[in-house]
Amino acid sequence: MKKGTVLNSEISSVISRLGHTDTLVVCDAGLPIPNSTARIDMALTQGVPSFMQVVDVVTWEMQVEAAILATEIKQQNPQLHETLLTHLEQLQQHQGNTIKISYTTHEQFKKLTADSQAVIRSGECSPYANVIICAGVTF
């Protein structure tokens, strides 16, 4: 369910159509995106916009129930992993719910993206900077 205001019309449209348990992916510049999944390409150049900039805007716009990450982020990108977990903790407090965080292999993560409503590609160029965001409800 849509909660705020996003200037990008494609992102706004996708979020407004999300139902309970639908998923939306925010990814780095290198994640392969299935042809069958809508692509919203925000990448301008390396690092612009960053993964966390996109995650921040998207997650404040929607009700988040869960997040799925690749297990590899823990070892290969620990700083970003901690930043993302901190953001989700703050979001959880703001929303008044518990956001379930789960992990899967990167290979399985790539397969799960095919079931998402859309993949939003950031300009991030650091390893495993990807998250599947699961929509919740505001009631």
Curated annotation (Swiss-Prot):
Reactions mediated catalytically = beta-D-ribopyranose = beta-D-ribofuranose
A Gene Ontology molecular function term for this protein is:
intramolecular lyase activity
Check the record and name the InterPro entries matching this protein.
Answer: D-ribose_pyranase, RbsD-like_sf, RbsD_FucU
Keywords from the named record: Carbohydrate metabolism, Cytoplasm, Isomerase
- Entry superkingdom: Bacteria
Q: Where in the cell is it found?
A: Cytoplasm
One GO cellular component term of this record is: cytosol
Give the main location: cytoplasm
EC no. given is: 5.4.99.62
GO terms classed as biological process: D-ribose catabolic process
UniProt keyword Zinc present: no
- Which residues are listed for substrate binding in this entry? D28, H106, Y128, A129, N130
Q: Which residues form the active site?
A: H20
Query: What family does the database annotate?
Result: Belongs to the RbsD / FucU family. RbsD subfamily.
Subunit composition and interactions: Homodecamer.
What does the record give as the function of this protein?
Catalyzes the interconversion of beta-pyran and beta-furan forms of D-ribose.
Name of the protein in its database record: D-ribose pyranase
